[in-house]
Regions:
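Short, well-structured N-terminal submotif of metal-dependent ribonuclease cores
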Residues: 1-39, 52-56, 122-131
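A residue-level structural signature of the nucleotidyltransferase/glycosyltransferase Rossmann-like core
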Residues: 2, 36, 67, 103, ...
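Structured helix-beta-strand junction loops
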Residues: 33-34, 64, 81, 114
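Short strand-turn motif at the edge of the Rossmann-like AdoMet-binding core
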Residues: 42
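Helix-adjacent hinge/juxtasegments
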Residues: 49-69
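Active-site neighborhoods of divalent-metal-dependent phosphate/nucleic-acid chemistry enzymes
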Residues: 63-108
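Acidic, PIN/NYN-like endoribonuclease modules and their adjacent C-terminal/linker elements
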Residues: 92-131
Length: 131
């Protein structure tokens, strides 16, 4: 199972945001234990900005995940997306480029029209555990 991890899940961990920390950290632990995970390129820049640098967090993160190769075609796909939020459309474009099975996010409602199924961190962990 290949997953793309949305920025909100990363920020839950980096900022220790309760009550989301446990499930979101579990997603990164799944990746650390060998699960196939990726983050969109722009998630890195969003985290760097919001974490006032966050080099250590990002360096550790990049030991666990891939960053899908995306380009102009993917950006145009995102711009033409039916999703209301453009940042989410860029997440979907990255997920499609990487052939992700799921997008792990807390913002499920933003991904209703996504061609890649969105799942919450808690539900993903249950699915990954076989439940």
């Amino acid at each position: 199972m290949r997953i793309l991890i949305d920025t909100d899940v990363l920020l839950d961990v980096a900022l220790a945001r309760e009550p989301h920390l446990t499930a979101s950290a579990g997603v990164l632990e799944w990746a650390e234990s060998g699960g196939e995970a990726a983050v969109a390129w722009h998630s890195l820049t969003n985290c760097a900005y919001l974490l006032k640098g966050g080099r250590s967090f990002l360096s550790n993160l990049l030991q666990l995940v891939e960053v899908p190769e995306t380009g102009t075609r993917d950006a145009l796909l995102a711009l033409d997306s039916p999703l209301g939020d453009l940042e989410d459309a860029f997440q979907v474009a990255a997920a499609l480029a990487w052939k992700a099975d799921l997008i792990v996010t807390r913002n499920l409602s933003d991904y209703r029209k996504s061609p890649v199924v969105a799942i919450s961190p808690a539900d993903f962990l249950a699915k990954a555990a076989g439940g």
